[in-house]
């Protein structure tokens, strides 16, 4: 859900084009593991489209992730003169991510899980059950100068952050491996700067 309010007004000789709002999102993702299927070899130069793997069956492995985010934001474009503009904005996010996963035990190869005592091979065993919460501050600022009616030059700078689990709703246990989704890791931060020019060369 997103509610946005826009307003245009003046403070003295400076024009403002303001956009403010609040946003609430809930994103969920569920993945299921399936039993492997062995298919016959295929000639890549003469593929056989009649080969079918048959129905896939779940093996008990699964992963469930959910992220709730509440945000407020405000952006303003200031018309300083006819040709010169300043712009800036800030967004504050509060997030909470929950994640759990289970793997079929007794398999082989990388990432295989040993079955606990008394648990049959192939049974799902919980491997991760964790959560992460926090606050993020993202902002940007810039300036633009109109050289002509059809062209301008601009400069922008922005700071954005992505918390663990922010791109795939998956978390990793604290202290385990080098995944960026570990719950003891800080959000990843990106600083972006840009200088450029834009020109309208086609008739509108």
Over which residues does each language-model region extend?
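Structural signature of Gram-negative outer-membrane beta-barrels, strongest in the C-terminal barrel
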Residues: 15-19, 23-27, 65-204
């Amino acid at each position: 859900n997103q509610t946005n309010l826009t307003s245009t007004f003046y403070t003295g000789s400076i024009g403002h084009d303001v956009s403010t709002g609040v946003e609430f999102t809930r994103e969920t993702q569920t993945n299921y593991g399936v039993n492997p299927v062995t298919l016959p070899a295929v000639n890549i130069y003469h593929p056989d489209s009649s080969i079918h793997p048959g129905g896939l069956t779940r093996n008990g492995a699964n992963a469930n992730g959910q992220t709730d985010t509440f945000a407020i934001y405000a952006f303003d474009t200031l018309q300083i003169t006819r040709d010169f503009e300043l712009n800036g904005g800030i967004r504050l996010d509060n997030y909470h991510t929950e994640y759990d996963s289970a793997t079929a035990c007794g398999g082989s190869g990388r990432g295989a899980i040993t079955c606990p005592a008394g648990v049959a091979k192939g049974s799902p065993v919980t491997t991760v059950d964790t959560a992460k919460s926090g606050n993020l501050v993202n902002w940007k600022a810039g300036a633009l100068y109109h050289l002509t009616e059809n062209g301008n030059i601009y400069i922008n700078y922005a700071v954005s952050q992505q918390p663990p689990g922010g791109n795939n709703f998956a978390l990793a246990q604290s202290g385990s491996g080098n995944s960026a989704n570990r719950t003891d890791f800080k959000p990843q931060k990106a600083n972006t700067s840009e200088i450029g020019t834009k020109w309208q060369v086609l008739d509108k």
